[in-house]
């Protein structure tokens, strides 16, 4: 089992924690991680884009001029794609971009992402993450104490003071342990996680 240091919000070492190898020490599967990221981004797409083909644009039923003798190129409709106001060739239509991964694949992708942070020494465990008031300045001080900039902060429970304090920092995202995903883990350089959140993740994914 990997043994990591535990810090307080002042950046001081206050203990250590053994991580479960079944979650934080698996063989990293980059293919599944990639699939999970693509799946998450695809599922976010609205898929509402739409344009009309020449068959759907109103008007243009009459031939604009006779076939021969005008000096113009022959035309059959003012709604052909080359005309202003005409239809679109291969017009985009609403579609569902989402695709699903099965539960086993999702689980292994999460484990791979967590393991990748441990292997890169980019996982910081906190004994707790509590704030008595909403103060972005204080939250920034915590990040400075931990020497991190771009981070995903994982909490064991929803804490409005922490969440609202971090909200205005563009390089930081907060999440609870039951809402982590591969995209956020790999997007942010460092994974900052509370000790209780580690226990919750190990309980869910073990």
Swiss-Prot record:
Xref: Pfam families: Ribosomal_L4
Residue ranges with Polar residues bias: 43-52
GO molecular function: rRNA binding; structural constituent of ribosome
Entry GO terms, CC: ribonucleoprotein complex; ribosome
Ranges for region Disordered: 43-86
InterPro entries, A to Z: Ribosomal_uL4, Ribosomal_uL4-like, Ribosomal_uL4_dom_sf
Subunit: Part of the 50S ribosomal subunit.
Record family assignment: Belongs to the universal ribosomal protein uL4 family.
Protein's recorded name: Large ribosomal subunit protein uL4
Organism classification: Bacteria, Bacillati, Bacillota, Clostridia, Lachnospirales
Encoding gene per record: rplD
């Amino acid at each position: 089992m990997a043994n990591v240091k535990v810090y307080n919000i002042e950046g001081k070492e206050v203990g250590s924690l053994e991580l479960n190898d079944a979650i934080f020490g698996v063989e990293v599967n980059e293919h599944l991680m990639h699939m999970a990221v693509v799946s998450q981004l695809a599922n976010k797409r609205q898929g509402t884009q739409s344009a009309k083909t020449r068959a759907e644009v109103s008007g243009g039923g009459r031939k604009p001029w006779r076939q021969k003798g005008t000096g113009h190129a022959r035309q059959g409709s003012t709604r052909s794609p080359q005309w202003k106001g005409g239809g679109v060739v291969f017009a985009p239509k609403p579609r569902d971009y989402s695709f699903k991964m099965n539960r086993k694949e999702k689980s292994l992708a999460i484990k791979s992402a967590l393991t990748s942070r441990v292997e890169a020494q980019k996982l910081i465990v906190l004994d707790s993450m509590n704030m008595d008031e909403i103060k972005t300045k204080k939250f920034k001080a915590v990040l400075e104490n931990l020497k991190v900039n771009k981070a995903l902060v994982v909490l064991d429970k929803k804490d409005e003071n922490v969440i609202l304090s971090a909200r205005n920092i563009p390089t930081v995202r907060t999440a609870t342990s039951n809402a982590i995903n591969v995209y956020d883990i790999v997007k942010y350089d460092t994974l900052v996680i509370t000790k209780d959140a580690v226990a919750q993740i190990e309980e869910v994914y073990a």
